[in-house]
C-alpha cells in the first residue's frame, strides 16, 4: 500500500508537474473511449475520430515514457467490436499498420517495448505482420512496455485460462485443490505484467467494458470526461495527481 508523505515540502517531483516520483503508478491501463462521438460532434466520419485517437496514443505514449510509467496498456479493440460496421472495423484493423510504420522508429529510440494481449484469430494478416515486426524489433527494449489489447475480452481471457488450467491438471494428474490465484495469473495473457495500479476511462462513461476484469480487482479507477482524441498530456498528469492523492488499501483499513 502506498503511504502518504507527511512532509510535502520534501516531496520530489517528476517532469516539472508536481508529480511525486515515489508514487508513480507502475502500470496504467486506459480504455480509449470517445473516438466516434468526437467525430460526430464535428460532423466528420467515425474513422476520422479513430485517426485522431491514434495521434493521441502517440502523445500519451511519449508522456508515459517520460514520466517513468513502466507499463501502459491500451484497450484498442475488444472482442465485441466486431459487431461494428465492416468499413469501420477494416479501418481500425489497418491502424496498427499505419501507427507502427510511422511511430516505430521513435518507439525504438525511446527504448519502448511493444507487446499485445488478445486473440490473433480473425485479425488480418497485415495487422498481425505489423504487430509481430514491432514486437521483434523492440523485444530487448527495457523502458516503457506499451501493451495493446487487440481483439481482447476479459471474459474470453478467463475462459481460455480455465481451459489451459484444466488441461494442465489433467496432464499432471492433479485435482482442483492446486488451483489458486497464482496459478490463474500464470495462465492469463498478462502473466508477465503487474496488475494495473490505475485504470483510466475517457469520455465520461463509468464502466470497464470487459477490460482486465481479473487484473483490475484492486486498481484505482478514474473516469475522465474528455473524449479520447481530446485527452492529452495535461489530462494524463491530472489523472496521476488524483491517483497520488488516494490511499490504496487493498481491502484493508486506512492508516488515518
From Swiss-Prot:
Any Pfam family from its record, for instance, is Prenyltransf
GO terms for MF: ditrans,polycis-undecaprenyl-diphosphate synthase [(2E,6E)-farnesyl-diphosphate specific] activity; magnesium ion binding; manganese ion binding
Catalytic residues? 33, 81 (proton acceptor)
| Enzyme category, top tier | transferase
Annotated CDD domains = Cis_IPPS
UniProt: Mg(2+) binding residues? 33, 220
The prosthetic group or cofactor this protein requires is:
Mg(2+)
Cofactor: how and how many bound: Binds 2 magnesium ions per subunit.
According to its UniProt record, the EC number is 2.5.1.-
Kindly list the positions annotated as binding substrate: 34-38, 46, 50, 78-80, 82, 84, 201, 207-209
Stored Gene3D superfamilies: Decaprenyl diphosphate synthase-like
Does the keyword Transmembrane belong to this entry?
no
Q: Which cysteines are joined by disulfide bonds?
A: none
One CC-aspect GO term: cytosol
Q: Which UniProt keywords apply?
A: Magnesium, Metal-binding, Transferase
Q: Mind listing the GO biological process terms from this record?
A: polyprenol biosynthetic process
- Asked if Transferase is a keyword of the record, the answer is yes
Function in brief: Catalyzes the condensation of isopentenyl diphosphate (IPP) with allylic pyrophosphates generating different type of terpenoids.
Which family is this protein grouped under? Belongs to the UPP synthase family.
What HAMAP family has UniProt attached to this entry?
A: ISPT
Quaternary organization: Homodimer.
Instruction: Spell out the protein name for this chain.
Output: Isoprenyl transferase
Gene symbol of the encoding locus: uppS
